[in-house]
Amino acid sequence: IGVVVDDSDAERDGPWNQSTRRPNHFGRHYLANAKGKGSHSITWKAALPKPGVYEVRASFCGGENLASNARYVIRHAKGETRILVDQSAKPTIDGLWFPLGRFNFEENAEGFLADKGDNNWVIADAIQFTPVNDLNKKAPLESPNLEDASTAIFRGAYTPFYYGFDGFKAPVRGHYQFRVKARS
């Protein structure tokens, strides 16, 4: 769905390590950099089929020893939005994609990631731009969709997280609303 730009088609600044060590990745491999200081980066550029609102998703493997504060930047029609993502959390869409937000784009879209992290590996795999027409249209632009939650489901970003009450770990910094609904 939409346009996918893999790491092999992205622009790199500085050396990155190609890897297939972790199983969940898009394409033949992903790129990784350890304990970066922000001097290396990767930029995904996409020519979109038409202007409009797109959901931007990042692919990363998730797991131990990955950055808890990967710094993504999405450049869109209204400027740019910076997003911190906990890459140690499992991606929420098919175990491969993590939604970064919905943004209005002209015909060109750009995603950026620097290797500055918290002494752990930063993963750069693929970025997906999916037209909102192909998805649920409820989410507002440039902000997480905090839809009504169902029974014991925590919502953050756009996809429900099925974590227990004792171990909830939000993969993106921000404000969350929790609602509990009792059923008999």
Regions found by a protein language model. Give the residues of each.
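Low-complexity, glycine/serine/threonine/alanine-rich intrinsically disordered linker
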Residues: 1-28, 40, 63-65, 76, ...
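A surface-exposed beta-strand-loop module
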Residues: 34-47
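Preference for bulky hydrophobic residues occupying beta-strand positions
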Residues: 44-46, 58, 72-74, 180
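Hydrophobic loop/turn residues within beta-sheet-rich immunoglobulin-like superfamily modules
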Residues: 47-49, 103
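A short tyrosine-centered beta-strand micro-motif
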Residues: 52-58, 176
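Beta-strand acidic-aromatic groove motif in beta-rich domains, primarily in extracellular
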Residues: 55, 65-73
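Substrate-binding/catalytic groove segments of enzymes
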Residues: 65-66, 80-82
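Solvent-exposed serine/threonine-rich low-complexity stretches and specific carbohydrate-binding patches
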Residues: 82-91
